[in-house]
Amino acid sequence: MQWQDHAIILGVKRHGETSVIAEVMTRDRGRHLGLVRSGRSRAMQPVLQAGNAVEVIWRARLDEHLGEFRVEPVTLRAARLMETATAVYGVQAMGALLRLLPERDPHPHLFDALEVILDHLHNPADAGELFVRFELAVLNDLGFGLDLAECAATGARSDLVYVSPKSGRAVSRAAGAPWADKMLLLPPFLSIEGNHAADFDSLSAAFRLTGFFLHRHVYEPRGIEAVAARDGFVQAALKALNPTLRTLSGPNGVSA
């Protein structure tokens, strides 16, 4: 069996003296593993770095086998991604999110989103907003999508400022007022009413929002914790927007 696809390197593990097992996110075949012979060579090591875009050819006798990759470089961005904490943690955190999905399960929209985010990790505001949308997309693909288009109580599509922690649906200001202290905030940049640039406060609220539902629907039921890289990314992104902030802490690995 053989196929060819666009891919992004997520990580590698040593295999024997000279080879590695590469983990990649492909556009049409999802997250996939494969053996790369001589993957530890001087020529291949720079190519097989997390965040790099590559072209892979996968071969195996049977579909269920691990198989082998032949890897050709396309965009080698890994060195640039090592320049800032936001980028370093972001690459690790997105890889961990993709590992929540079944192996070999196609998610082409997540592949496309990953490529966009990797090229914006140098800008904390853009990276933070894109990362939140990526987490929302992963939640949706896992079957736990949030409904932020209309008020759960009234059906209104304007002045949506809350999200119900029970239903994961948006709630308008008026309908949610009696329970405001129990609601999650809906960041303006996630509202359907118009374009709003992400800032420190809205990103903080957004990280709390996605962190809450990832913990409730994914991490807690599976008995796992969010990777430290998520908290590292959140802190780096928020600190870049507010350099005077010394420590950032909050529930579910989200920053306040």
UniProtKB/Swiss-Prot annotation:
Gene3D superfamilies found in the cross-reference section: Nucleic acid-binding proteins, Recombination protein O, C-terminal domain
GO cellular component assignments: bacterial nucleoid
GO biological process, any: DNA recombination
InterPro entries: ARFGAP/RecO, DNA_rep/recomb_RecO_N, NA-bd_OB-fold, RecO, RecO_C
Pfam families per record: RecO_C, RecO_N
Keywords noted in UniProt: DNA damage, DNA recombination, DNA repair
The organism's place on the tree of life at top rank: Bacteria
NCBIfam families per UniProt: reco
Record function comment: Involved in DNA repair and RecF pathway recombination.
Family: Belongs to the RecO family.
Protein name: DNA repair protein RecO
Lineage of the species this protein comes from: Bacteria, Pseudomonadati, Pseudomonadota, Alphaproteobacteria, Hyphomicrobiales
Gene field: recO
